């Protein structure tokens, strides 16, 4: 069983490296960074506690919101989804991402107090 899992993962990585555009790889690295940041914040919450609760919630909401916005950006700039987003150029999608991210972080900073 482990041989088949290893072969599936190996094939997935080979196809990912060969067929994924560089823009999407960079965005995937950003998504991984945000995911790890959110996981570390949650682990910290479990181990240490949530004494400054608003700060913890703000950081975690920022991680989750940024992850969701980045996934939406990835969907919009993926060349395979070009038919679904005909009226939206990659530059427009990135501008929308920046605007939504700015609004998200204004809310997060306001929530901290």
Curated annotation (Swiss-Prot):
- Biological process according to GO: apoptotic process; protein glycosylation; protein N-linked glycosylation
**Self-association and partners:** Component of the oligosaccharyltransferase (OST) complex.
Q: What does this protein do?
A: Subunit of the oligosaccharyl transferase (OST) complex that catalyzes the initial transfer of a defined glycan (Glc(3)Man(9)GlcNAc(2) in eukaryotes) from the lipid carrier dolichol-pyrophosphate to an asparagine residue within an Asn-X-Ser/Thr consensus motif in nascent polypeptide chains, the first step in protein N-glycosylation. N-glycosylation occurs cotranslationally and the complex associates with the Sec61 complex at the channel-forming translocon complex that mediates protein translocation across the endoplasmic reticulum (ER). All subunits are required for a maximal enzyme activity.
**Record-stated family:** Belongs to the DAD/OST2 family.
Chief localization: endoplasmic reticulum
List UniProt keywords, sorted A-Z.
Answer: Apoptosis, Endoplasmic reticulum, Membrane, Transmembrane, Transmembrane helix
Q: Name one Pfam family in it.
A: DAD
Which gene is the coding source of this polypeptide chain? dad1
* Source organism: Xenopus laevis
Q: Does the keyword Transmembrane apply?
A: yes
**Which pathway does the UniProt entry assign to this protein?**
Protein modification; protein glycosylation
**Protein name stated in the entry:** Dolichyl-diphosphooligosaccharide--protein glycosyltransferase subunit dad1
Give the InterPro entries listed for this entry. DAD/Ost2 (IPR003038)
Q: Where in the cell is it found?
A: Endoplasmic reticulum membrane
Lumenal topological domain residue ranges: 52
Q: Which superkingdom is the protein from?
A: Eukaryota
Q: Which residues cross the membrane?
A: 31-51, 53-73, 93-113
Q: In what way does this protein cross or attach to the membrane?
A: Multi-pass membrane protein
Q: Which residues lie on this side of the membrane: Cytoplasmic?
A: 1-30, 74-92
Can you quote a single GO CC term? oligosaccharyltransferase complex
């Amino acid at each position: 069983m482990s041989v088949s899992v290893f072969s599936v993962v190996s094939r997935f990585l080979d196809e990912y490296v060969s067929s994924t555009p560089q823009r999407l790889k960079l965005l995937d690295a950003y998504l991984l960074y945000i995911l790890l940041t959110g996981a570390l914040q949650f682990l910290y919450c479990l181990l240490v506690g949530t004494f400054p609760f608003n700060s913890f919630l703000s950081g975690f909401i920022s991680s989750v919101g940024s992850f969701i916005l980045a996934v939406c950006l990835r969907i919009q700039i993926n060349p395979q989804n070009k038919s679904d987003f005909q009226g939206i150029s990659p530059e427009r999608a990135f501008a929308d991402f920046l605007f939504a991210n700015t609004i998200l972080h204004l809310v997060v900073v306001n929530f901290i107090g």
